[in-house]
Each structure stands twice: as structure tokens, then as C-alpha cells.
Amino acid sequence: DDLYRHGMDVTCVSGVTSVEKPMWIDLDIQCLDPNEMLLELKTLAKDKIDVWVHTAAVLDYVIEEQIEGKIASLQGDLNIGMKEGAKHILELKDLCKGAVRIGFKFESGIKQKDLVHRAHAQIKTANMTATIANRLEDYGKEGAPRGWLVDSHGAHFILKTELDMCSAIRSIIENHR
């Protein structure tokens, strides 16, 4: 919403979500499957987009073998096999060369120092411009930061509020264009 209000064209590619998207989004590509989403993103990358904001990780794990239809009751315990899903930011790395890329690193149960380290590693491995790092246990907690902005040099800056986060994202975009 913030980027749109500051004059930027925004395209949204989303999976299954409970978040309601703003009415102003002209192009909203909804994908029910992570692989379908990756194909859409690769198609969009052919248009040489200037800025990519990867706001949420696609499923880290996906169901190994999906079963169509209903499973009959009284069949006993179910074991569901999971496998690691494709890392979209890595898959898009070469297709987005030259673009500003901002990612998010959302973790739980780790120290802030380790979170920043993982965010910086993401920047290096996926060729990101910057990453917004945050932790589940901090979300919505009074006095806890909204996250940390981590740059390509490993420097990190506290983002106290959602507005701080939006301003940081906008600044990164404006400073790298």
C-alpha cells in the first residue's frame, strides 16, 4: 500500500492467504500452488522489472504426494511426507540481475544476532539488495521492534514500527534506482 501511495506501480503475486489485498491493485496474480507461483514469477521476470519485494517466503516444505479427493474415515493414522520446496528467491536470482531486490527473513526461536546473520547470508546467496528480518516472538509484542533492516554489508538497523519498515523499503528503492 505504501509503495502505491508513493507513485509506484505494484503487481502482486500471491498464494493462499488470509490477508485481504487492497482494491487498488490492478494486477493481482493468485496462485494456489508454489510451483505455479514460481512459473508466474519467472514469466514476469522477462519484463525486466526494476524492483522486486519478496514479502513472504513461499512454503519451506510442501506435501510430497498429494492425494486427490477425500480420505475415508476410520483408516487409522495418517503419515504425510513433506519435502523441501523450491526457494523462489534463489530461482529468480539470475532472472532479476540488475534489479533492486528486497527480501524478508522470518524466523522463530533464535537470537537477534543470529537472525541478522541469516538475513545477511540470504542477501549474499540470493543476490538481494537488502533484507527485512523479523521474529515470530516479537510480532505484535509491545515494545518489540517490527524488525531489522539488513544491508549487503551486514549493517543492521532497528525498525520500531510498520511505518519504519515501509519507509526503509521505500528508501532502499529510491537510493538504488
Language-model features: where?
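A cross-family phosphate/adenosyl-ligand binding-site feature
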Residues: D1-R177
